[in-house]
Curated annotation (Swiss-Prot):
Protein family membership: Belongs to the radical SAM superfamily. CofH family.
Entry-linked InterPro entries: Aldolase_TIM (IPR013785), CofH/MnqC-like_C (IPR045567), CofH_family (IPR019940), Elp3/MiaA/NifB-like_rSAM (IPR006638), F420 (IPR034405), FO_synthase_su2 (IPR020050), rSAM (IPR007197)
Function: Catalyzes the radical-mediated synthesis of 5-amino-5-(4-hydroxybenzyl)-6-(D-ribitylimino)-5,6-dihydrouracil from 5-amino-6-(D-ribitylamino)uracil and L-tyrosine.
Known catalytic reactions: 5-amino-6-(D-ribitylamino)uracil + L-tyrosine + S-adenosyl-L-methionine = 5-amino-5-(4-hydroxybenzyl)-6-(D-ribitylimino)-5,6-dihydrouracil + 2-iminoacetate + 5'-deoxyadenosine + L-methionine + H(+)
Swiss-Prot/TrEMBL keywords: 4Fe-4S, Iron, Iron-sulfur, Metal-binding, S-adenosyl-L-methionine, Transferase
Gene: cofH
Enzyme class, broadest EC rank: transferase
UniProt protein name: 5-amino-6-(D-ribitylamino)uracil--L-tyrosine 4-hydroxyphenyl transferase
Assembly behavior: Consists of two subunits, CofG and CofH.
Domain Radical SAM core: 56-290
EC number: 2.5.1.147
Pathway terms, separated by semicolons: Cofactor biosynthesis; coenzyme F0 biosynthesis
PANTHER family per the UniProt record, alphabetical: FO SYNTHASE (COFH), LIPOYL SYNTHASE 2
Residues that, per the record, bind [4Fe-4S] cluster: C70, C74, C77
Length: 365
């Protein structure tokens, strides 16, 4: 019987020859321990260089979280509030437009907005907010909503999700967030986000968005109660969608922030992913998602030092400047508000690479 190291060498050699990684093979990579993780990271970095080149990219963006009031009770969330809780906010039209105008004055090219599911929101609420933003910041790329918000708006308004997406696009939606994916395995979803749309509904709405010319990101939230096999299944679902639609702009792994979350306090989740897992998530994703050009590391979730390591394990993008971020902060993250491009450049140059500013759709600025 071949040793694990021999198996790994053979598999990585096959990948260089054009072999497409299978789910069982991806699972083997996720289960790797010891110095072999560096071998996987190096192979992923070579793939990154071949697919995306050497530049480390970023987008100048600003986040707007409109409200933290939410009808859902996702176990992984430390951001949402219920009626009567302390600290509830809902930004007015004036406040939202002030934030959008500020973003425009900062030279931001993208405004990103995803919020709680406000009990009074309808599809028209989202559409109206998008009009406010694009009115205050004309020409901005609005990266907003996600399949859960689309489904919620449709249900509240008696509309189809296709009608909601069409209305959002007409109001200025340029691309959609691929969040609310978490782990696309329903038994896991029942534990961490009971009440959210099931896997097949998330997939359907993503495909629908792509069919309407609305590109989306793709995400995974890992490091809680899922297994390595669950992670592989999730990646396989994303790869199959991309084979069909080519509508994903990037893959963004989101490491679970545990500190202030119900599932951690209740003993249903562990204390987040380890550094080994963070590194392998980027590397295995680069090797498995062979139809994705761009893989991002989240400095918000992992901190800048771990994010830098991800850039030599298959990632090519550092995400955005953000300016403000409430969801990860609510869960206990400390690196959430703003990352200066000068610091991004220092990180990139430390690896012998150059920083390049991009648009949301990865055109270079």
């Amino acid at each position: 019987m071949r040793t694990m190291n021999h198996d790994l060498q053979g598999l990585l050699s096959d990948l260089k020859g054009g072999h497409r990684l299978g789910e069982d093979e991806a699972l083997m990579l996720f289960e790797t321990r010891g110095r072999d993780i560096w071998t996987i990271a190096a192979a992923a970095d070579e793939r990154r260089e071949a697919v995306a080149g050497d530049p480390v990219t970023y987008v100048r963006n600003q986040n707007i979280n409109v409200t933290n009031l939410c009808v859902n009770a996702c176990g992984f969330c430390g951001f949402s509030k219920k009626p009567g809780d302390d600290g509830i906010y809902y930004h007015s039209r004036e406040e939202i437009q002030q934030k959008a105008a500020l973003a425009k004055s900062r030279g931001v090219s993208e405004i990103c907005t995803v919020s709680g599911l406000h009990p009074h929101f309808t599809a028209e609420s989202y559409i109206e907010i998008y009009r406010w933003i694009t009115e205050a910041a004309p020409g901005i790329h609005l990266h907003a909503s996600n399949p859960m918000e689309v489904a919620y708006g449709a249900e509240r308004s008696g509309m189809t999700t296709r009608e909601v997406l069409t209305g959002m696009k007409a109001a200025g939606l340029s691309s959609m967030c691929g969040t609310a994916a978490e782990i696309l395995v329903d038994p896991v979803r029942d534990t961490i986000c009971r009440g959210k749309i099931p896997t097949d509904e998330w997939v359907r709405i993503i495909r629908e968005a792509h069919s309407l010319g609305i590109p989306t990101t793709a995400t995974i939230m890992y490091g809680h109660c899922e297994t390595e096999a669950d992670r592989v299944r999730h990646l396989a679902i994303l790869r199959a969608i991309q084979d069909e639609t080519h509508g994903f702009t990037e893959f963004v792994p989101l490491s679970f922030i545990h500190m202030n979350t119900p599932i951690y306090r209740q003993g249903l989740a562990r204390a987040g992913a380890t550094g080994r897992e963070d590194l392998l998530m980027v590397a295995v994703a680069r090797l498995f998602l062979d139809n994705f050009r761009n893989i991002q590391v989240s400095w918000v979730k992992e901190g800048i030092k771990m994010a830098q390591l991800g850039l030599i394990a298959g990632a090519n993008d550092l995400g955005g400047t953000m300016y403000e971020e409430s969801i990860s902060k609510g869960a206990g993250a400390t690196n959430t508000d703003y990352l200066d491009p000068a610091e991004m450049q220092r990180v990139a140059e430390d690896l012998g690479r150059m920083l390049e500013r991009r648009t949301t759709l990865y055109d270079m600025c």
